[in-house]
Amino acid sequence: MSKPRTRVAVIFGGRSNEHSVSCVSAGSVLRNLDPERYEVVPIGITTEGSWVLGSTDPESLSIRGRSLPSVDADGSALALTADPTRSGDLVALDDGEAGKILASVDVVFPVLHGAYGEDGTIQGLLELAGVPYVGPGVLASAAGMDKEFTKKLLAAEGLPIGFQVVLRPGTATLTDEQRSRLHLPVFVKPARGGSSIGITRVAEWAALDDAIAHARRHDPKVIVESGIAGREVECGVLEFPDGDVRASVIAEIRMPEGADDDEAFYDFDSKYLDDVCEFDVPAKLEDSVSDEIRALAVRAFSALDCQGLARVDFFVTEDGPVINEINTMPGFTSISMYPRMWDAVGVDYGTLVSTLVDTALARGTGLR
C-alpha cells in the first residue's frame, strides 16, 4: 500500500509591494514539488488581503515579458481556521458553501515576501492554528524583516555590520551630526521591505529628501546606510530535518561594466526584469574568505534564531566581509540566487523544497 501524500498549502501573493515576486516564487515551488510525494493546495492572497483557492498551473504565475503576475479574486474564497483542534482546516467562505471544509493541510509553505507575510504575521497565525510551516518562526521573521532590529541583533553577537541611521515616522531628515557620521554615497531604504523596492542610491545630499520621500511611500520608517565599497555576495543557509544547519556556496552579483552611478546597485529591475546582472556561482573568492562568509552566515542565522532557511547578503571589503541583510524567505524564482546556490552543491530545486517541507514537519509548532 502506497504511503499517503503529504498535503502542502503553498501560500503566495499577499498585501505587500512584493506581491508579484511572491507569485513568481510560488510558481517555481509548484513546478518543483514532487507530485508523487505531495498533494499541493495553492492559496493566493489578493493585494486587498482576501484568501482564495489558486490555480495549480505554475505557468499562471510566470513573468511574461515585463508583465508581472498577481492574484485575482476569482477563486473560491477561504480561510484557515485558527482553532488548533481543527489544525490545517481550510474553510469555504462563499455563499452556499460557507463553513464547508475544502481541505485539511499537513504543512504550509508560505512563499510570501515582505509585510503581512514574511514579517512574522502569518507565522503567528500558523502557530496559533497549530499548523507546521516552512521557514523561521515569529521572532526571527519579524526581526529579519526590520533592518533596524536585524542589525541590532547581529551587532549584539559581535557580527560585522555597516553603519545606519533610523528615521522614524515624524523625523523628516538627517541631522548635521548624522550626516557627518555617514559618507556618500548613502542608500535610503524602507526599513521593512525587500526585493530592492523603494531603495535610492544618493550620491549628493541635495537628493536626500526626495529619496526619503520615495522610501516612505513604502514604509514610514526609513533606513539610511553608508555605502560600502566591496564585492556584493550572498550565502544560503539551510536547516535539515535532523537539525543540522549548513551554508551553501557563495554567489557574487556583478553589475555590467560601464553601468553609471544610478544603475550601480542590484535594484528590482536588475533582479527580475532586465537580465543585466552577471552572476558567479560559486563566487571567485579565496577559500579562506569563502569559509569565513559561510561561518558568518550560519552565525547570523543563529543570532536571529532562524529555522528552516535564510539568505545572508554581504559586502566583501578590503577589511573583510560585512553583513548587509538577512532574508528569511528569499526569492524562489527560477533565477533566484538561493536555489541556484544550493544547486551548485548538488541540492537541486526539487530536493531543496522537499528538505524544507520535511524540516517543517520534523519541527512542528509551539515553543522549541
Curated annotation (Swiss-Prot):
Residue numbers binding Mg(2+) 2: E325, N327
One Pfam family of this chain: Dala_Dala_lig_N
Co-factor requirement: Mg(2+); Mn(2+)
Residue stretches in coiled coil: none
Location in or out of the cell: Cytoplasm
Superkingdom of the organism of origin: Bacteria
GO MF entry, a single one: ATP binding
Its EC number(s): 6.3.2.4
Free-text cofactor note: Binds 2 magnesium or manganese ions per subunit.
Keywords, sorted A to Z: ATP-binding, Cell shape, Cell wall biogenesis/degradation, Cytoplasm, Ligase, Magnesium, Manganese, Metal-binding, Nucleotide-binding, Peptidoglycan synthesis
Nucleotide-binding in keyword set: yes
Listed GO CC annotations: cytosol
Amino acids binding ATP: 179-234
List of residues binding Mg(2+) 1: D313, E325
GO biological process: cell wall organization; peptidoglycan biosynthetic process; regulation of cell shape
NCBIfam families (UniProt xref): D_ala_D_alaTIGR, PRK01966.1-4
Similarity remark: Belongs to the D-alanine--D-alanine ligase family.
Function statement: Cell wall formation.
HAMAP family reported in the protein's UniProt record: Dala_Dala_lig
Protein's name according to its UniProt entry: D-alanine--D-alanine ligase
